[in-house]
Amino acid sequence: MIVDSSVIIAIFLGEPDAPDLSLRLRRAPVRRMSTASLFEAGIVLDQRVGLEPNEPADELYALLQRAGIELVPFTEDHAQIARVAYRRYGKGRHPAGLNFGDCMSYALAKSLDEPLLFKGTDFSRTDIRVA
């Protein structure tokens, strides 16, 4: 299963759906996340939590480790898939309205033919398998 940044953000911030998302993560035999999605999650959490530029992101990495999430490098092939995803499902082009970060998760899920765990409804309007 591929994990979108929205899931990590929700769990990290203790949002109302965090327990359900955590359970779904634990039940998956394989959990992967793109390094591009990790970067996105880090940016969002830095903004919401208010980390200073020199503060380490240890808590985010600890969460990934506890959840058993394998980080997968974002490749040129992923970039090509993400570009096609944006053309098909991007904001202003399609009701799914995928943004830059969404396309990164989409690309990894598509390239590995794995379902995607995410928060919200955007991906359910695409051809991606839902976890």
Where do the language-model regions lie?
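Residues that scaffold the ATP/ADP-binding catalytic core of kinase and kinase-like folds
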Residues: 10-12, 44, 126
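Short, well-structured N-terminal submotif of metal-dependent ribonuclease cores
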Residues: 1-33, 37, 48-62
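Short loop->beta-strand "edge-of-pocket" segments that line small-molecule binding or catalytic clefts
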Residues: 28-32, 67-72
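Active-site neighborhoods of divalent-metal-dependent phosphate/nucleic-acid chemistry enzymes
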Residues: 70-115
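Acidic, PIN/NYN-like endoribonuclease modules and their adjacent C-terminal/linker elements
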Residues: 106-131
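Glycine/charged-rich beta-loop-alpha catalytic/anionic-binding loops adjacent to active sites
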Residues: 20-23, 62-66, 86-92
